[in-house]
From Swiss-Prot:
<feature type="compositionally biased region" description="Low complexity">
    <location>
        <begin position="614"/>
        <end position="625"/>
    </location>
</feature>
<dbReference type="InterPro" id="IPR013783">
    <property type="entry name" value="Ig-like_fold"/>
</dbReference>
<dbReference type="Pfam" id="PF00041">
    <property type="entry name" value="fn3"/>
</dbReference>
<feature type="domain" description="Fibronectin type-III 1">
    <location>
        <begin position="39"/>
        <end position="131"/>
    </location>
</feature>
<feature type="signal peptide">
    <location>
        <begin position="1"/>
        <end position="32"/>
    </location>
</feature>
<comment type="function">
    <text>May be an activator of G protein signaling.</text>
</comment>
<feature type="compositionally biased region" description="Polar residues">
    <location>
        <begin position="1027"/>
        <end position="1060"/>
    </location>
</feature>
<feature type="region of interest" description="Disordered">
    <location>
        <begin position="515"/>
        <end position="1271"/>
    </location>
</feature>
<feature type="compositionally biased region" description="Polar residues">
    <location>
        <begin position="626"/>
        <end position="641"/>
    </location>
</feature>
<feature type="compositionally biased region" description="Polar residues">
    <location>
        <begin position="941"/>
        <end position="957"/>
    </location>
</feature>
<feature type="modified residue" description="Phosphoserine">
    <location>
        <position position="717"/>
    </location>
</feature>
<feature type="region of interest" description="Disordered">
    <location>
        <begin position="1311"/>
        <end position="1350"/>
    </location>
</feature>
<feature type="compositionally biased region" description="Basic and acidic residues">
    <location>
        <begin position="786"/>
        <end position="799"/>
    </location>
</feature>
<feature type="compositionally biased region" description="Low complexity">
    <location>
        <begin position="1445"/>
        <end position="1504"/>
    </location>
</feature>
<feature type="compositionally biased region" description="Basic residues">
    <location>
        <begin position="565"/>
        <end position="574"/>
    </location>
</feature>
<keyword id="KW-0677">Repeat</keyword>
<feature type="domain" description="Fibronectin type-III 2">
    <location>
        <begin position="158"/>
        <end position="258"/>
    </location>
</feature>
Length: 1894
């Protein structure tokens, strides 16, 4: 064996020789070459003997010992080659006894000779010391642990085999032996067989039983160049002989085998529906790592089936793209290797189905010709699409007048139709016809345009056309083919009726498109509608026709139609800008998405555009068209953007909607419109009854919209009569419900109409807007076919919109849902550019790309403008009346303006509004008519409010209609409010992106465009106080500046506030206004007020957080839209607000919080984004604290409200310190929730002079950095900062919100908490806490200890007083720096979290720390610490280090002593820490309680900046100089840097050593360096060491901008990225570890008693959390419901882009505020929205947010995701005892003729089983070389996965299962677990999602 081993080493030796010779050649020192030869040869005759004392090694010296002297011998031994111990013996020794060996264990021994020139090659031996007992395993005796049974007589057990020899080759070992002695047949020791074992170590052996006659055996498929131990035993019935061990080294593969290898790992990746990429591994190249030039590969493929013909491709590369395949077909692929003349064997076949795709070609030979004798009819024919394009679902024939491409209409025909008649054309016109096909996967391309000229005729009467439209409905069936009728049943009537209707519609539109006559989509409805509409206006018929047309597509391509419909409204919005077609076009841009889908929408819009009246009618027509297409489209676009034209038209149609008290006039209009819509709806419902019978509720919003659609007057009427609107909505609802049932299109249409009329109208408009915008979008998509411009946008929008609309429709609490959904979608769907183009107000959308909400919110603001307050009030009253009518409200929610902005600002909205929107939802809380704006805004109330708001808004709208934008904004606002997202959005809009809104928005806020775009001129004027450009800003600011002025005026001052605060300022101001008085209460936050009860502390705080979040959100909307919102929110808020401008500002914020409905939004709104949520949690606490402070320093407070909340109340206590403290606190920004305090920290305040906002932001950021800290320490920075703090908070929050929300601390480097932040605790302003008491709500309160049971019976002590987790030995859990991990009570009062907010102990008492969060804590840091979202690793346990505390500092006895290193006075860590921690979360009512760790000068005077300060965009932070002053660029804009930078540079202070017994990371535990109040905290920075973003670090921007495929990762303000080790598999479980477990049961008990209403607000701050490198899942996170709402659960809706445009949503329920969405496809856009529910029903739906998944990892999956392995749901038999997963079960067939079964924990964690047969039992898999990591091969992953739980094979029960040793090895069946070398696990994470299909 030695020679063989030596032989195997020759190759390496040659290599070294070559290297040495090369060196010799290069270095002209010949002697070196000679010297290199002097290393010794290997020792000879090496023997390894087993003795009682151990293992004895003997050897002889090597040859040539004289010429190559040996200086010493090296002996290495161990159980495996990976764990060897080394011993050196001198050259004169030739034997050695190894004593420290375990009996019965196989040891490898390596012997080498060494001298100064080198080492010989090793000689390997293996043997096991005597001892151990024999046990039977797998039917064969195997040596196991335990003493050897010496009593067994040798007479019975056979002797061991003789002369065992092992020969090795590159991948196999040949073993030969002689029979043992005395083994004859008659011998008592005869052998009945042999047991051969082999493996890479003694404990991981594979055993092969052999017959007694065998004398050789070959072990195949081994790894080359590896050392194996081989054991051989003879056995008989009595037992086995002693084993004989040999060690052998497999050789390098050198010579090419005669037989060519078979390719491995063939993978087929779907590239498109017609192409796949086949790749494979060439085993030779893999092993030799060199390319063989003559090697060729042949790929063969065919359709599945034995008779199919093979196609071949030959290539020299190891991958090939195979194209021209047939979609939706299973193909078989195989590969072989060829070299020279030789061909290898074909590999096993791999099967892959090509995905079905949308048609890739258009129908050919489209021919259109006039029908003789019928000047209005043409016949069309086309060729059917080939089968290769998939089964055609329907054909969509689009046509438009050649000179009016925006008036496009579409008719749909069943897939088997190839001809059609189109009626209703204009004689003498030239028409463009195009056709496209659709299948289940989507729309195909358009054919080339075919132009046909209609013969002239005297008959072209619009009325006749209208009648025709009505008639054609009947004739539809008579249209060219029955299909046409079928389609006509749907939106598209048969060709003739539809065409005719379309034409009539066009005419109607041209003549009087009222866009409201949302006639039923169906032809019949149309017929009726035509008449009814005629009564109302022919427009309705037109719309009806459109609707019917669209409808027809709806049934077959309902979604498309809807999309189209959606589009037009957007378009309408734009159109509205000008009466002429241009306006339409402008609108069209909004509609672009939709345009492709629904040309009809376009034509409607276009035709009305021709003249101002037509424009007016057009707007209605648009509505109609949208309505026809989709109720929502028409409403939103036309109204909002049509304000100018539309307003005129509306006024005409509706009376004068805008100028008049929209209420009165619109109402009257409404009644008729209502009637008409009702009838229309009815018609529709009759037409479309079957389509969506279930959508009545959903449709209600539509119905409302439809009613509005029914006539131009309808919108006004809806607006004007609060009751009417509401009533209308309600009545419409019934009708709508039928229409909704019809297909939701009608519903959509109706909303569209509403939108039109109420585009100024409040909610109805808003909702309609949303709907219509949605519809429009979809319409736009269809229309886009006709129109070249904006098609993509439109289509997108349309899809989105449609999805939204449908969702809305589908929602039972449809009113709200529709609106909400529509709104967001509209915003989304709309093409922003179009919106902006559409009209000046369009800017609104730009300002709030989330235009739906923003525009809404803004309008609301304007409508609430000072001039409109009464309106609002009146409205408010009405709203309250209407309140009960959620549907109405919903419709109202979607104002067209809102909608329009939505399209453009949707994304932004989605970001900011989402938060904002969710805030909005809460916003509705305010019911005070007082604040006019607020009233409208209240959408929080939204149903009723919305209705009222709608009325108000309508009047406001009418009012604003004068400034058409204003009216729109008003309605938008209103809508937004009801649709809460919009309001929030709008608010945030003003402040800009929602993320921005919190902190940054303010800066942007100043950009009036936002406001402008948001409000339109009208809104601006409404917001007289705020500048037109700042309408929205003012909104955001309103909360803040409130001190300057109440109402609008406050908005103007608000701008800076808003900016400083981001959206928050507005919220603050509103809060101020809302809750001036309330602010006084210590519960600074509105929440505080509500939640104020200290008893609630944590809960209150949390509630506060949630409320404040909502309120804040709302307030931001309110702030601009002003105080209105806020005031609305706080019924008295508006009055209070004015009174409270100065002082209460921060308070206002609190009040806003306190006033659950009203103030909430303001304070939170800024946070509206997820960040807001995080912030909101923080904010809540902070707001509580900040607000309290705020009372003192209104401005500051307001901006810092949360943070300073304690300051205000506390402020009173602390006098100078209070403010400073509070400001400091703001800096600390205790994060109630997750301990996001650190993250919450605001940047240091800018210099006192700097704007509060700026300062606020910086202050928040600075805490992180020492420099920042220093400003914090400075009085001026803090005070300002305080003022600003909330804004800063917001500003940071925007990004932070989600993360913060996730972990609160996660945002910023959690580790480096605001290092600069003074270590002051609550009581300290750099001095000891005089009060010594902890805030009631503070965590300090949970004094005491809790014992929890850890894994494996371990016990842990949670010491809440000291903030530690200890084990029985007194060792404490430590952080990544070896310091004690600080813990506190979570916001839910049950979860124990670290100061970063990362859960450490679950509410059920389960530990969440340790290795992978499932093991026992470690004594020292792990290699890869688990990081909370804040970035802090959880390390393990360390004995508490006793550090010298500063002599002066003594810790409070209760707390572990954590003297502040610099601080002279130790802070009682307990109270302080706890409090801080808690304070943030809990309401820190007492000023003393909240301590801003950020240093705040005791003397802090809170300057209240009077001018808004620009802030940085979301994702970036302001730069501050050493003094904490904001660094401004030459152009007056603050210098910004990426948010992440903050972690890196600013955290230097973290390096400061901590003198305390434990490092306190929490803000609370700010390093207790006492710094003079005025001193900057720099010296104090002994804060936590700066943390480098580690695994789990959270950021709104991905660490890597590009994914593995080189695509840019999707970035948005509401998107947060977690990073992970690129080599680790994706783990949903790990990602979820970053989320705090929020418990609803804490809120429910009290609230259930209070209310019997369904949730009144939509969830806010929706954030999408993605993990870099993981495309298959995201975690949707959102803010809790407003405190007033009782929420027992949530529904999360998700849809891919294709589903979104079809309004096809998947729904999942969640009991907490986050939910993972799994099995997402790569490179795909998804949409998400959330809805709260309780036992009384469902609340409104949040606006949707979108996210684009990243590319798949091309190196991960063996087969492509598009053609991922087909996992079949199948419940197989298995033993569930040994799995950690108990979810759904899937199976798939594998290439190795086994069935793989998986039981899911989640899509990325599962237990893998194998079986030979589907019906047999499935077994676990064992691994003798590892922990099953390579079993990921069974689920087609190339990755070595992670497995768990970690254990030892001895702890695993012995079970039956499959086992193998290495990847690619065939599995064998036997026992695994204890007593075997085969380890099995309870779960696997392989990075591959199962089932992998979304």
């Amino acid at each position: 064996m030695a020679p063989e081993a030596g032989a195997t080493l020759r190759a390496p030796r040659r290599l070294s020789w070559a290297a040495l010779l090369l060196l010799a050649a290069l270095l002209p020192v010949a002697s070196s070459a000679a010297a290199s030869v002097d290393h010794p040869l290997k020792p000879r005759h090496v023997k390894l003997l087993s003795t009682k004392m151990g293992l004895k090694v003997t050897w002889d010296p090597p040859k040539d010992a004289t010429s190559r002297p040996v200086e010493h011998y090296n002996i290495a031994y161990g159980k495996s080659l990976k764990s060897l111990k080394y011993i050196k013996v001198n050259a004169e020794t030739y034997s050695f006894l190894i004593e420290d060996v375990e009996p019965g264990v196989v040891y490898f021994v390596l012997l080498t000779a060494e001298n100064h020139s080198g080492v010989s090659r090793p000689v390997y031996r293996a043997e096991s010391p005597p001892g151990g007992e024999w046990i039977e395993i797998d039917g064969f005796p195997i040596k196991g642990p335990g003493p050897f049974n010496e009593t067994v007589t040798e007479k019975e057990v056979p002797n061991k085999p003789l002369r065992v020899r092992v020969r090795s080759s590159d991948d196999r070992l040949s073993v030969a032996w002689k029979a043992p002695r005395l083994s004859g047949a008659k011998s008592p020791r005869r052998s009945r067989g042999f047991l051969l074992g082999y493996g890479e170590s003694g404990r991981k052996m594979n055993y092969v039983p052999l017959t007694r006659d065998e004398r050789t055996h070959e072990i195949k498929k081994l790894a080359s160049e590896s050392v194996y131990v081989v054991s051989l035993q003879s056995m008989n019935s009595q037992g086995r002989s002693q084993p004989v061990y040999r060690a052998a080294l497999t050789k390098r593969k050198i010579s090419e085998e005669d037989e060519l290898d078979v390719p491995d790992d063939i993978s087929v990746r779907v590239m498109s529906s017609q192409s796949v990429l086949v790749s494979w591994v060439d085993p030779v190249l893999e092993k030799q790592k060199k390319v063989v030039a003559s090697r060729q590969y042949t790929v063969r493929y065919r359709e599945k089936g034995e008779l199919a013909r093979w196609d071949y491709k030959q290539i020299a590369n190891r991958r090939v793209l195979i194209e021209n395949l047939i979609p939706d077909t299973v193909y078989e692929f195989a590969v072989r290797i060829s070299q020279g003349e030789r061909d290898g064997k074909w590999s096993t076949s791999v099967f892959q189905r090509t995905p079905e795709s949308a048609p890739t070609t258009a129908p050919e030979n489209l021919n259109v010709w006039p029908v003789n004798g019928k000047p209005t009819v043409v016949a069309a024919s086309w060729d059917a699409l080939p089968e290769t394009e998939g089964k055609v679902k329907e054909y969509i024939l689009s046509y438009a007048p050649a000179l009016k491409p925006f008036g496009a209409k579409s008719l749909t025909y069943p897939g088997d139709t190839t001809s059609a008649l189109v009626d209703g054309l204009q004689p003498g016109e030239r028409y463009l016809f195009k056709i496209r096909a659709t299948n289940r996967r989507g729309l195909g391309p358009h054919s080339k345009a075919f132009i046909v000229a209609m013969p002239t005729t005297s008959k072209a009467d619009v009325e006749q056309n209208t009648e025709d439209n009505g008639k054609p409905e009947k004739p539809e069936p008579s249209s060219p083919s029955p299909r046409a009728p079928a389609s006509s049943q749907h939106p598209s009537v048969p060709a003739s009726p539809q065409g005719r209707n379309a034409k009539d519609l066009l005419l109607d539109l041209k003549n009087k498109i009222l866009a409201n006559g949302g006639a039923p989509r169906k032809p019949q409805l149309r017929a009726k509608k035509a008449e009814e509409l005629d009564l109302q206006s022919t427009e309705i018929t037109g719309e009806e026709e459109l609707g019917s047309r669209e409808d027809s597509p709806m049934s077959p391509s309902d979604t498309q139609d809807q999309k189209r419909t959606l589009r037009p409204p957007s378009r309408h919005g734009h159109s509205v800008v000008a009466p002429g077609r241009t306006a339409v076009r402008a609108r069209m841009p909004a509609l672009p998405r939709r345009e492709g889908v629904d040309k009809p929408g376009f034509s409607l819009a276009t035709q009305p555009r021709p003249g101002a009246p037509p424009s007016a009618s057009a707007s209605p027509a648009h509505h109609a068209s949208t309505q026809g297409t989709s109720h929502r489209p028409s409403l939103p676009a036309s109204l909002n953007d049509n304000d100018l034209v539309d307003s005129d038209e509306d006024e005409r149609a509706v009376g004068s909607l805008h100028p008049k008290g929209a209420f009165a006039q619109p109402r009257p209009a409404l009644s008729p419109s209502r009637q008409s819509p009702s009838s229309v709806l009815r018609d529709r419902s009759s037409v479309h009854p079957g389509a969506k019978p279930a959508s009545p509720a959903r449709r209600t919003p539509h119905s409302g919209a439809a009613e509005e659609d029914s006539s131009a007057s309808a919108p006004p009427s809806r607006l004007s009569p609060p009751h009417g609107g509401s009533s209308r909505l309600l009545p419409t609802q019934p009708h709508l419900s039928s229409p909704l049932s019809k297909g939701g299109k009608d519903g959509e249409d109706a909303p569209a109409t509403n939108s039109n009329a109420p585009s100024r109208s409040t909610m109805s408009s808003s909702v309609s807007s949303h709907l219509s915008s949605r519809t429009q979008v979809s319409e736009g998509a269809e229309a886009s076919d006709g129109e070249s411009h904006g098609d993509g946008d439109r289509e997108d929008g349309g899809r989105q919109a449609e999805a939204t609309a449908q969702t809305l429709r589908a929602r039972p609490a449809s009113g709200h849902f529709h609106l909400l959904r529509h709104k967001p979608f509209a915003a989304n769907g709309r093409s922003p550019s179009r919106f902006s183009i559409g009209r000046g107000p369009r800017l609104q959308p730009s300002s709030s790309p989330q235009s739906t909400v923003p525009s809404r919110a803004h309008p609301r603001v304007p409508s609430h403008s000072d001039s409109h307050p009464k309106l609002s009030s009146g409205i408010h009253g009405d709203e309250e009346d209407e309140k009960p009518l959620p549907a109405t409200v919903v419709n109202d929610h979607v104002p067209s303006s809102s909608r329009q902005p939505i399209s453009r600002g949707w994304e932004d909205l989605r970001r900011s509004p989402q938060r904002g929107a969710s805030l909005h939802r809460k916003e509705p809380i305010p019911e005070n008519p007082k604040s006019t704006g607020a009233d409208t805004h209240p959408q929080g109330k939204y149903s009723s409010l919305a209705s009222k708001a709608q009325d108000v808004q309508q009047s406001t709208d009418a009012d604003t209609e004068g400034h058409s934008p204003k009216a729109q904004p008003g309605s938008t606002d209103r809508h937004a409010s009801p649709a809460r997202p919009p309001a929030a959005r709008s608010q945030q809009h003003p402040s800009v992106p929602r993320r921005m809104t919190p902190g940054r928005a303010p800066q942007q806020q100043p950009p009036p465009p936002v406001a402008t775009s948001q409000h339109h001129p009208g809104p601006q004027s409404r917001d007289a106080g705020r500048s037109p450009s700042q309408p929205r800003l003012s909104l955001t600011q309103a909360g803040r500046p409130r001190p300057t002025s109440q109402g609008r005026s406050h908005s103007s001052s608000d701008p800076y506030t808003a900016s400083s605060r981001g959206m928050l300022p507005t919220a603050l101001q509103n809060q101020d206004e809302d809750a001036q008085g309330s602010y006084d209460d210590d519960s600074t936050e509105v929440e505080a007020q509500d939640v104020r009860a200290p008893a609630h502390a944590a809960r209150a705080k949390e509630a506060a957080a949630s409320l404040p979040k909502h309120q804040q959100v709302e307030s931001p909307t309110g702030a601009g839209a002003g105080g209105d919102h806020r005031s609305q929110r706080g019924h008295a808020a508006s009055p209070a607000r004015p009174s409270r401008p100065g002082g209460p500002q921060s308070r206002a914020r609190v009040p806003s919080r306190a006033a659950p409905g009203k103030s909430e939004p303001p304070s939170k709104r800024p946070l509206s984004s997820k960040s807001q949520q995080s912030v909101s949690a923080e904010d809540d606490e902070e707001e509580d604290a900040g607000f309290f402070k705020g009372g003192k320093e209104d401005l500051l407070s307001s901006s810092v409200p949360k943070w300073p909340s304690s300051s205000t109340p506390r402020g009173g206590k602390d006098a100078d310190g209070s403010l400073a403290k509070e400001e400091r606190e703001p800096a600390i920004a205790l994060a109630p929730r997750g301990g996001s305090l650190a993250p919450v920290k605001r940047p240091l305040p800018p210099p006192p002079g700097s704007s509060p906002r700026a300062s606020h932001v910086p202050s928040r950021l600075p805490p992180r950095s020492a420099a920042t800290v220093s400003p914090v320490a400075g009085t001026h920075p803090w005070p300002q900062y305080t003022t600003r703090a909330p804004p800063g908070h917001f500003s940071t929050t925007p990004m932070l919100s989600l993360r913060q929300r996730m972990m609160h601390a996660r945002f910023r480097n959690p580790l480096s908490r605001q290092p600069a932040r003074p270590s002051y605790r609550q009581g300290y302003n750099g001095r000891p806490n005089v009060e010594g008491k902890v805030l009631p709500g503070s965590n300090g309160k949970p004094n005491g200890q809790r014992i929890i049971n850890g894994p494996q019976g371990t016990k842990w002590v949670v010491d809440l007083d000291r903030g530690l987790v200890l084990n029985a030995e007194g060792r404490y859990l430590q952080d990544s720096h070896g310091n004690p991990l600080r813990i506190k009570l979570g916001g839910d009062g049950r979860t124990i979290v670290d100061l970063e907010g990362t859960p450490v102990v679950s509410p059920d008492g389960l530990p969440l720390f340790g290795q992978g969060r499932h093991g026992t804590p470690l004594a020292n840091a792990q290699d890869k610490p688990i990081l909370s979202l804040g970035g802090k690793p959880l390390v393990g346990l360390e004995v508490i280090k006793k550090t010298t505390h500063p002599p002066t500092t003594t810790m409070q006895p209760t707390t572990t002593t954590t003297p502040l290193p610099t601080t002279t006075t130790p802070r009682p860590t307990t109270a302080t820490t706890r409090r801080t921690t808690t304070t943030r979360r809990t309401t820190t009512r007492r000023p003393t309680t909240t301590v801003r760790t950020t240093t705040r000068t005791t003397t802090t005077t809170t300057p209240t900046p009077t001018t808004p300060i620009p802030t940085c965009p979301p994702g970036t932070l302001e730069r501050h100089d050493d003094d904490g002053n904001l660094i401004m660029s030459s152009n007056g804009i603050p210098e910004c840097y990426a948010e992440e930078d903050e972690f890196s540079g600013l955290e230097t202070d973290t390096a400061v050593p901590t003198e305390e017994a434990y490092v306190i990371y929490d803000e609370d535990y700010e390093f207790e360096t006492s710094r003079p109040p005025t001193t900057t905290e720099p010296s104090t920075t002994a804060t936590t060491p700066r943390v480098i973003p580690e695994e789990g670090a959270i950021s709104s921007f991905p660490e890597e901008e590009f994914d593995l495929a080189g695509r840019k990762r999707f970035v948005a303000p509401y998107v947060t990225y977690l990073n992970k080790d690129p080599s680790a598999p994706c783990s949903l479980t790990d990602a979820l570890d970053h989320f705090q477990v929020d418990s609803l049961d804490e809120i429910i008990p009290n609230d259930l008693k209070k209310s019997d209403l369904p949730p009144q607000h939509a969830p806010r701050n929706i954030t999408v959390v993605a993990v870099e490198g993981c495309h298959s899942f995201v975690i949707v996170d959102w803010d809790k419901a407003t405190p007033g709402d009782v929420v027992t659960g949530y529904l999360v809706y998700s849809a891919s882009y294709e589903d979104f445009i079809r309004n096809k949503w998947s729904t999942q329920a969640s009991s907490v505020t986050h939910l993972p969405i799994e099995n997402l496809k790569p490179n795909t856009r998804y949409y998400f929205k959330v809805q709260a529910q309780n036992p009384h029903g469902y609340g409104p739906i949040s606006p949707s947010v979108s996210f684009v998944t990243e590319s798949d990892n091309p190196l991960l999956v063996v087969r492509p995701p598009g053609g991922e392995p087909i996992w079949i749901p199948f419940a197989f038999k298995h033993d569930p005892s040994y799995t950690d997963c108990h979810g759904r079960q899937y199976v798939k067939r594998t290439w190795y003729r086994k069935f793989v079964g998986v039981v899911l924990c989640n899509s990325l964690r599962y237990k893998i089983y194998l079986s030979d047969n589907l019906k047999d039992t499935f077994y676990s898999i064992g691994d003798s070389w590892g922990r099953g990591e390579d079993h990921c091969q069974f689920v087609d992953s190339h990755l070595d996965g992670r497995t768990g739980p970690q254990s030892y094979v001895e702890a695993l029960p012995t079970i039956q299962g499959y086992y193998r040793q290495y990847r690619q090895e065939p599995v064998r069946f036997g026992n695994i677990g204890f007593g075997t070398p085969y380890y099995y696990v309870g779960w696997y994470e392989c990075g591959v999602s199962i089932p992998g299909k979304w």
